[in-house]
UniProtKB/Swiss-Prot annotation:
Entry keyword annotation includes DNA-binding: no
Organism from which the protein derives: Methanosarcina barkeri
Domain of life (superkingdom): Archaea
GO molecular function: ATP binding; enzyme regulator activity
Protein family according to the UniProt entry: Belongs to the P(II) protein family.
Protein name according to UniProt: Nitrogen fixation nifHD1 region GlnB-like protein 2
Function according to Swiss-Prot or TrEMBL: Could be involved in the regulation of nitrogen fixation.
Pfam families referenced in this protein's UniProt entry, alphabetically: P-II
Cellular component per GO, a single term: cytosol
SUPFAM superfamilies: GlnB-like (SSF54913)
Keywords linked to the UniProt accession: Nitrogen fixation, Transcription, Transcription regulation
GO biological process: nitrogen fixation; regulation of nitrogen utilization
Amino acid sequence: MKEVTAVVRPNKMSVTKDALDKIGYRRMTAIPVLGKGKQRGISGELNFYIQPKLLAKRYSTGMKYIPKRLLSIVVNDEDVDQVIKTIIGVNQTAQIGDGKIFVESIDEVIRIRTGEKGELALK
């Protein structure tokens, strides 16, 4: 099993969720996060108003953190490539700020309610 963690634009979360749902991955964890990278705070991505004087200041000093969504999905090994392709397919704009995907091995999954382990806990 693998954990696929993606950091995506907030405005892409709905289409990402729908695309993953279409390939059978309805279970996921999504968390609003703040981060920074090469993008350095493109204001067009923000969902709230920024006062013009603060916007002017941002261009001179750079915004420290911008809103993103962190999406975590535990998948079977054979589904990792399909999940990654799906996430890239709906999030790739060829612009700085499209996000990142991380893949890590998961040793065990246990459903708390039933005690089921492994692939049974993912169903």
